[in-house]
C-alpha cells in the first residue's frame, strides 16, 4: 500500500505550501537543492548558491511508499514540490518530465504593453543540476492510447500496480 499524489496539470502556487506538504514526508532535514540570486546587471552576475533544506513537519508525517505523478504541465511551485519530493527515499516520481520554472517568478510590463515573466532566481537540485527546464521522473510512463479511449488513466494504474508490487518498469520492457 501507499499514497499517490497527482500534480499533473498543476500550474503552481505558493512555494511555502509546497514545502509544508513535502515536510510531511520526511523525519529528518534533507538537502533538496540550491538557489542563486541576481547580484548585478551582468548576464552572469549571480550569488554563490545557497542551500535549500527541507525541515520535517512537527505534525503527522507519512513514511510509507509514495508516488508523485507529473507531466509537462507541472510548473513553478509544483516543480519545486516535485524536486523536494524527489529527494526523499520513500518517494518515486512517475509520469513525464515537469514543465519547469521556479516558484519565484518576476513579472513586468514592457513599454509596448507586453508582459514579461521569468524565473528571477535559478534553482538547482541537490546535485547542482538546473531544474528550471523541468525534472525527469524516476519512472517514465506515457498514457496508452487504447486505455485513453476507454477512459482509463494508464499512469495512475501503473502507480497503483507499482505500490502493490505488481509492476516494475523493468518488467514492462
Give, region by region, the residue ranges found by the protein language model.
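Extracytoplasmic/secreted envelope proteins and their assembly/folding machinery
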Residues: 18-22, 66, 78-82, 152-160
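Low-complexity, Gly/Ser/Thr/Pro-rich intrinsically disordered linker/tail segments
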Residues: 135-173
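Sec-exported extracytoplasmic/periplasmic mature domains
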Residues: 1, 23-30, 86-90, 160-168
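Terminal peptide-recognition signature
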Residues: 5, 25, 66, 85, ...
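C-terminal soluble interaction/assembly domains
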Residues: 86, 93-111, 116-118, 122-124, ...
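Gly/Ser/Thr-rich loop/hinge elements
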Residues: 12-65, 124, 130-131
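Short acidic catalytic loops
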Residues: 1-12, 68-69
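Extended C-terminal subregions enriched in glycine
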Residues: 65-87, 92-99
Amino acid at each position: 500500500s501507499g499514497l499517490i499524489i497527482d500534480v499533473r496539470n498543476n500550474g503552481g502556487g505558493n512555494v511555502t505550501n509546497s514545502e509544508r506538504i513535502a515536510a510531511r514526508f520526511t523525519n529528518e532535514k534533507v538537502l533538496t537543492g540550491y538557489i542563486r540570486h541576481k547580484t548585478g546587471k551582468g548576464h552572469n552576475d549571480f550569488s554563490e548558491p545557497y542551500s535549500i533544506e527541507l525541515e520535517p513537519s512537527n505534525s503527522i508525517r507519512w513514511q510509507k511508499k509514495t508516488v508523485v505523478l507529473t507531466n509537462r504541465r507541472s510548473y513553478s511551485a509544483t516543480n519545486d514540490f516535485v524536486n523536494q519530493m524527489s529527494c526523499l527515499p520513500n518517494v518515486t516520481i512517475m509520469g513525464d518530465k515537469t514543465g519547469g520554472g521556479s516558484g519565484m517568478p518576476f513579472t513586468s510590463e514592457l513599454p509596448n504593453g507586453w508582459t514579461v515573466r521569468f524565473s528571477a532566481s535559478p534553482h538547482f537540485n541537490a546535485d547542482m543540476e538546473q531544474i528550471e527546464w523541468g525534472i525527469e521522473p524516476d519512472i517514465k510512463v506515457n498514457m496508452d492510447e487504447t486505455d485513453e479511449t476507454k477512459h482509463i488513466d494508464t499512469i495512475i494504474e501503473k502507480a497503483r500496480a507499482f505500490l502493490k508490487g505488481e509492476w516494475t518498469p523493468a518488467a514492462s520492457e
